Amino acid sequence: MLVPKRVKYRRVHRGHMRGEAKGGRTVAFGDYGLQSLENNWITNRQIEAARIAITRYMKRGGKVWIKIFPQKSYTSKGVGVRMGNGKGAPEGWVAPTKRGTIMFEVGGVSEAVAKEALRLAMHKLPVKAKIVSKAEASKEVNA
């Protein structure tokens, strides 16, 4: 599972998820990518589930690139704990993903296999997404 090796601060502010992604909008490594259409947090477990779905469908063929990393911790208080007394303990890790971000890329397989693998991964994620080719993604950024 993806987790940071070390962080400067264990607890971070929630922050805002407004607007579109500034970077990471092009398919850089593979031939096809999975592009987010919504702003949301994606947990390390969801990323891992999507990765497994892609690799199992491709059956050792091709290559997968994960373009998002869960670097932000989220906290929660225990059940039955009263309000106050500080922020809760770190619960897990999330990757804040904005609209337009390429989350996964695949290469080295046919178009049909790549699209089906990414479609399966889409169902594991909490955001609406679309499958884009290298040419489509670069056209959108330049427009």
Swiss-Prot record:
GO terms for biological process: translation. The keyword S-adenosyl-L-methionine does not apply. It comes from the Bacteria. Gene3D superfamilies: Ribosomal protein L10e/L16. Keywords: Ribonucleoprotein, Ribosomal protein, RNA-binding, rRNA-binding, tRNA-binding. The gene is rplP. This is Large ribosomal subunit protein uL16. The keyword Lipid metabolism does not apply. PANTHER family: 50S/60S RIBOSOMAL PROTEIN L16, LARGE RIBOSOMAL SUBUNIT PROTEIN UL16M. Belongs to the universal ribosomal protein uL16 family. It comes from Oenococcus oeni (strain ATCC BAA-331 / PSU-1). Part of the 50S ribosomal subunit. InterPro entries: Ribosomal_uL16, Ribosomal_uL16_bact-type, Ribosomal_uL16_CS, Ribosomal_uL16_dom, Ribosomal_uL16_sf. One of its GO terms (cellular component) is cytosolic large ribosomal subunit. It holds the Pfam family Ribosomal_L16. GO terms for molecular function: rRNA binding; structural constituent of ribosome; tRNA binding. Binds 23S rRNA and is also seen to make contacts with the A and possibly P site tRNAs.
